Amino acid sequence: MAVLTSRSTDFPRWYQDVLAKAELADNGPVRGTMVIRPYGYAIWERMQAEVDSRIKAAGAVNAYFPLFIPESYLRREAEHVEGFSPELAVVTIGGGKELEEPVVVRPTSETVIGEYLAKWTQSYRDLPLLLNQWANVVRWELRPRLFLRSSEFLWQEGHTAHADEADAAAYARRIALEVYRDFMTQVLAVPVFVGVKTRRERFAGATNTMTCEGMMGDGKALQMATSHELGQNFARAFDIDFLGADGARHLAWTTSWGCSTRMVGGLIMAHGDDNGLRVPPRLAPTQVVVLPVRDEETVVAKARQIAAALTDAGLRVQVDARPGLSFGRRVTDAEIKGIPVRVEVGPRDLAAGNVTLVRRDTSEKVPVPLAEVATRVPVLLGEVQADLYAEALALRESRTTDVATVAEAARAAQAGFARIPWRLVGEEGEAELAEEALTVRCIQTPDGGIPEAGSDADDLVCLIARSY
């Protein structure tokens, strides 16, 4: 009997099977909430570490702001509150008494952080002010799906203030490219289209939204991260101004940007196969699992010795010698969890001075001399990383179709992405597509670049797809 539903038979059911069998997450007691299990959280911690290092390299520093936000704060930016109102969780009672003013459970933090950007920004010398926080947020979700859409999720949100529009725009673009795109291509091994959102899809209160869009294994799009230029909308609402070098007061220009645990769902759907997860080595909490074939003292001792050598080589290694579990069961567990490389240690191989290396992505088995394990495994991990990216890129290229009409785009987007000149779609065509549950995922320049904010050049193209 198959452990997992086949992806080709029922992709949504397969996704749920992987969540359960790989021990990634479970449903929480309140509809729309989730429990992230230790292995799922270990993957998220690896994502955090990689993204956080890139955020810090871009000059931002971490801080933390309150979970509860006065309702009046949200009302100070009209478009923002209108965009989030249907998703808000509002607290009206505290300590057994009705609150004088209801407080909103953080859906995003532009408003509360805006209050403190105003407090901390006095002079042009204080700018740019570049902040980030790792937190949980609540957006009441009517159609929850673990990691993809949940009422509470974990994320990072960056918020910055700048002295001029050009600096703010350049920084928002830098985050989209040097933080998000770099992480997704270099670590997550998911190729992404980076472009701007249409006015219809733009973040509430933003003047421009940049997005990273990945193609999942079923051809649907997943928004992996966004970076927003907020213009002076929030600066005006929260009095974020400063004394300029010219001696006059000026409003600041602000940005916000974020990615979330939704990326764990993207990892599953972009790389998973009928045997479970396939985790890229640069991301994997455990890059190598060493499996003794038999529960014999000499075999287990050699497995631990090999693991120690691989750990000394800088790899993340686990020995699975759990008593009472067959070798086959331990292999299945390693496959479902997507550990990139297995080192199988058996008495016959040891007698010949070898072990067997097994790639999770291809199931290819290679006998390797014991003396070469510590040098061969890192090379193999590099090959797995590159091949997973190449496979995802090949899928995207094979399922992205250039079309010339909105009707053709609607047909092509049933199986993948449709690419079409934006001038042939426009807001009218976008509304037509919405009736068929299709969206314009992003607008790009002809060479796949990010257009300048507000550009209406005739040669812009857009990507249309079904989405999560």
From Swiss-Prot:
E.C. no: 6.1.1.15
Family annotation (InterPro entries): aa-tRNA-synt_IIb, aa-tRNA-synth_II, aa-tRNA-synth_II/BPL/LPL, Anticodon-bd, Anticodon-bd_dom_sf, Pro-tRNA-ligase_IIa, Pro-tRNA-ligase_IIa_arc-type, Pro-tRNA_ligase_II_C
Main subcellular localisation: cytoplasm
Pfam families on file: HGTP_anticodon, tRNA-synt_2b
Catalytic reaction list: tRNA(Pro) + L-proline + ATP = L-prolyl-tRNA(Pro) + AMP + diphosphate
Entry GO terms, CC: aminoacyl-tRNA synthetase multienzyme complex; cytoplasm
UniProt record, GO biological process: prolyl-tRNA aminoacylation
SMART domains: ProRS-C_1
Keywords linked to the UniProt accession: Aminoacyl-tRNA synthetase, ATP-binding, Cytoplasm, Ligase, Nucleotide-binding, Protein biosynthesis
Coiled coil: none
Domain of life: Bacteria
Subcellular location: Cytoplasm
GO molecular function: ATP binding; proline-tRNA ligase activity
SUPFAM superfamilies: Class II aaRS ABD-related, Class II aaRS and biotin synthetases
Domain notes: Consists of three domains: the N-terminal catalytic domain, the anticodon-binding domain and the C-terminal extension.
Description of how the protein assembles with itself and partners: Homodimer.
Main function: Catalyzes the attachment of proline to tRNA(Pro) in a two-step reaction: proline is first activated by ATP to form Pro-AMP and then transferred to the acceptor end of tRNA(Pro).
Family statement drawn from the similarity comment of this UniProt entry: Belongs to the class-II aminoacyl-tRNA synthetase family. ProS type 3 subfamily.
Protein name: Proline--tRNA ligase
Protein source organism: Frankia casuarinae (strain DSM 45818 / CECT 9043 / HFP020203 / CcI3)
Organism taxonomic ancestry: Bacteria, Bacillati, Actinomycetota, Actinomycetes, Frankiales
Gene that encodes the chain: proS
